[in-house]
């Protein structure tokens, strides 16, 4: 059976002076809690190796909900353990109503009106002022991020050398281009590729809400681009090369944390086949999976091919090409997160369950339908806590690979996952009020 997570490329023990290490955190709504579990395990293995202090990732690129995790790590790059502990605290205490309006009134105001417009748009077109911008209102998320992430610290981390660069990606509804906004202390020239550009910017919370604005689900966010306002949505849309920003920013080794399985084992697809006409929820889940998951797997395979090709070239020929090998470690879920979400659909607030039921999300457990869509919206501790546990266990199961990738000595785990979950809340302890 093929491994659902590709192995690291050219992995070998190395001295701590190896080139800059980048971190890629992809999108996926509530699925981003899995990233936190991976990071918690990496932090523990790092402590076991006798290291602490500043982040091992001076270059971080985040997309969608991964942008929130990326910005948190970057703004606390002087204390990697504290940043990760804070993220664990956030995600295992997060609730739906801290991300989007989940009360009955809020759903009536946005979701039901949006569904009515979709079904009776021809009849209500004259009431343009009432047209909603999205299925759900994510203004609670913006309020949470303004309190949670101290973006002013990013300049300090860059100036002190704890960070080299932070990149946040978004997709412009205005121009159709995929845009990577990046902030650095040292000058790095922006890059231009087909339908994707990079722009140096002073990153803000608004960049995070733009990058995490799941299409149809959350409203677009206006950002300034070359002095003109443009409307942006989720950075996973039209992101054909999610690993590219870290490479452009100078990373020579990259840890990629996915939000879905990179490859399905034989036989697993047939069990998940839709046997009748798909519901709106199943179609939406399929579309979101295409946006969030497919590009990363393709980009990893592309990088593998480039690395393999370069390894076949004579030394002189390798020196003559601008291409360079980039070592990458990919950690992605060993379980289908759709199935995991199906076990926890019942934990959603009644108003959200009612809204999702209207588009075909029904049942719980093995008999559930539409759970792919639910997996992006299930910001509840029962689900995010399981994702954190899964991220930890997947990473610890590949402990030897992780230790080799970072050049840490191979050794047994010094702390069990349960104890890792009980660590103090890091920088989150200094924040006012409950998360």
Where are these regions (language model features)?
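N-terminal low-complexity/intrinsically disordered extensions
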Residues: 1-21, 112, 413, 423-435
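Patatin-like phospholipase
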Residues: 16-24, 30-139, 145, 182-194, ...
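Extended hydrophobic secondary-structure segments that form protein cores and membrane-embedded regions
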Residues: 22-25, 57-64, 165-171, 328-332
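Alpha-helix termini
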Residues: 44-53, 153-158, 312-321
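Active-site periphery "cap/insert" segments of enzyme catalytic domains
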Residues: 129-170, 177-181
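C-terminal helical/tail subdomains of lipid-metabolizing enzymes
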Residues: 132, 145, 308-435
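Active-site gating loop/helix substructures
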Residues: 159-252, 256-287, 366-378
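Acidic, Ser/Thr-rich peripheral helices and adjacent loops at domain boundaries
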Residues: 268-309, 351, 355
């Amino acid at each position: 059976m093929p491994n659902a997570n590709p192995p690291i490329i050219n992995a070998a023990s190395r001295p701590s002076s190896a080139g800059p290490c980048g971190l890629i955190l992809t999108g996926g709504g509530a699925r981003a809690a899995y990233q936190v579990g991976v990071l918690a395990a990496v932090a523990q293995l790092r402590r076991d190796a006798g290291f602490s202090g500043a982040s091992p990732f001076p270059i971080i690129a985040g997309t969608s909900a991964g942008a929130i995790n990326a910005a948190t790590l970057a703004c606390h790059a002087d204390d990697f353990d504290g940043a990760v502990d804070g993220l664990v605290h956030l995600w295992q205490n997060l609730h739906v109503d801290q991300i989007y309006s989940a009360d009955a009134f809020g759903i009536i105001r946005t979701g039901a009106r949006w569904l009515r417009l979709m079904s009776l748009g021809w009849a209500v077109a004259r009431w343009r002022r009432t047209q909603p911008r999205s299925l759900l209102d994510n203004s609670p998320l913006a309020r949470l991020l303004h309190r949670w992430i101290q973006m002013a610290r990013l300049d300090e981390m860059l100036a002190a050398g704890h960070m080299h660069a932070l990149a946040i990606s978004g997709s412009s509804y205005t121009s159709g281009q995929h845009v990577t906004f990046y902030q650095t202390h040292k000058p790095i020239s922006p890059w231009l590729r087909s339908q994707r550009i990079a722009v140096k910017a002073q990153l803000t919370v608004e960049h995070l809400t733009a990058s995490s604005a799941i299409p149809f689900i959350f409203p677009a966010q206006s950002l300034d681009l070359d002095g003109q306002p443009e409307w942006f949505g989720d950075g996973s849309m039209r992101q054909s090369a999610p690993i590219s920003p870290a490479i452009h920013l100078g990373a020579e080794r990259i840890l990629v944390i996915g939000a879905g399985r990179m490859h399905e084992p034989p036989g697993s697809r047939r069990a998940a086949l839709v046997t009748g006409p798909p519901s709106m929820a199943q179609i939406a889940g399929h579309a979101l999976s295409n946006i969030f998951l497919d590009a990363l797997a393709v980009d990893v395979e592309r990088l593998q091919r480039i690395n393999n090709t370069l390894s076949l070239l004579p030394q002189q020929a390798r020196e003559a090409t601008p291409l360079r090998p980039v070592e990458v470690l990919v950690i992605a879920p060993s379980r289908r997160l759709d199935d995991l979400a199906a076990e926890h659909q019942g934990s959603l607030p009644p108003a959200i369950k009612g809204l999702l039921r209207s588009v075909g999300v029904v049942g719980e457990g093995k008999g559930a339908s539409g759970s792919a869509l639910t997996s992006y919206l299930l910001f509840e501790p029962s689900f995010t806590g399981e994702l954190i546990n899964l991220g930890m266990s997947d990473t610890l199961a590949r402990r030897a690979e992780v230790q080799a990738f970072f050049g840490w000595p191979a050794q047994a785990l010094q702390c069990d996952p349960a104890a890792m979950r009980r660590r103090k809340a890091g920088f989150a302890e200094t924040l006012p009020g409950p998360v």
